[in-house]
Amino acid sequence: MTNQRTTRDGSHGTESVPTQRSRESTDEDHGCPECNGDLVTDEDRGETTCGECGLVVEEDGIDHGPEWRAFNAQEQDEKSRVGAPTTNMMHDKGLSTNIGWQDKDAYGNTLSGRQRRKMQRLRKWNERFRTRNSKERNLKQALGEIERMASAFGLPDSVRETASVIYRRALGEDLLPGRSIEGVATSALYAAARQANTPRSLDEVASVSRVDRGEIARTYRYVARELSLEVAPTDPASYVPRFCSDLELSGDVERRARDLLAAAADAGITSGKSPVGLAAASVYAAALLTNERVTQNEVSTVANVSEVTIRNRYHEILDAGGEPGVEA
């Protein structure tokens, strides 16, 4: 079957032209049948044309988008009829309905006392239906803990999502008996932060958790082993950007600190030492070398390590980097 072709200059042809073409394809297999040029789709006009010779390959194309039009992001959000995407950060993945606590009707008017009592009963039953068994209640409590701790650290949603998936796996493989919900939730967040290269030290995690450092460490090792989590050893350099930001130091300090850590790693002095202590000492040394004064106490507070650790690592890092001594 042949289709009549029309070009922008009004000429006609009778060569065979495929009636259906990919709207966004620009490779050779879906090029212009006349000159093999790239095809361009005008969604407003419903036309697919050749960008080289102007051949109209397809006319009156079907618009697969919504039937409504929006001219800005706000209008698009208001007219969209789909809900939020599913998320592992909620125990029901965000698929259930939640009744708000505003006690107002659709027009913004305050509900009467009788209506408020009715809504309170509905909320109570709604919450019961959302968590139908002990497993869902367990998951709801744990994900709430993960959200609370991640918010305290300012961790991105990607880390929270990963931590939620790790906890779901631990729950699914029955790793919780004999361990607290808070302990497993904290270890899941600790592992997720390390996997995303935004690590937090055990001391930092323990400062916002409801369990102590020892339990977090034990639970983390158990969960990582049972779930075969791929968690690489923490790179001290991954702490440097956060420390520099908290201390309001420049990018020069951050770059110098990374160079010092790289030299220390090449010299083999980082093995068996705390990554947090190495990062703190490198930031302190880099600040002094770039004439941006910062005290050991300030670095100690931000990194949550002792000043003694900073002093010890400081001299080792300078020696490894071949830097001249700077009075601490």
Swiss-Prot record:
Keyword Zinc-finger listed: yes
Keywords (A to Z) from UniProt: Metal-binding, Repeat, Transcription, Transcription regulation, Zinc, Zinc-finger
Coiled-coil stretches noted in the UniProt entry, renumbered to this chain: none
CDD domains referenced in this protein's UniProt entry, alphabetically: CYCLIN_TFIIB_archaea_like_rpt1 (cd20549)
Gene3D superfamilies per record: 1.10.472.170, Cyclin-like
Sequence repeats: 144-227, 238-319
Ranges of compositional bias, category Basic and acidic residues: 1-12, 21-32
Stretches the record annotates as Disordered: 1-47
Lineage top rank: taxon: Archaea
Residues where Zn(2+) binds: 32, 35, 50, 53
Zinc finger (TFIIB-type): 28-58
Gene Ontology CC annotations of this record: transcription preinitiation complex
GO MF annotation list: DNA-binding transcription factor activity; TBP-class protein binding; zinc ion binding
SS bond list: none
Protein's UniProt name: Transcription initiation factor IIB 4
Underlying gene: tfbD
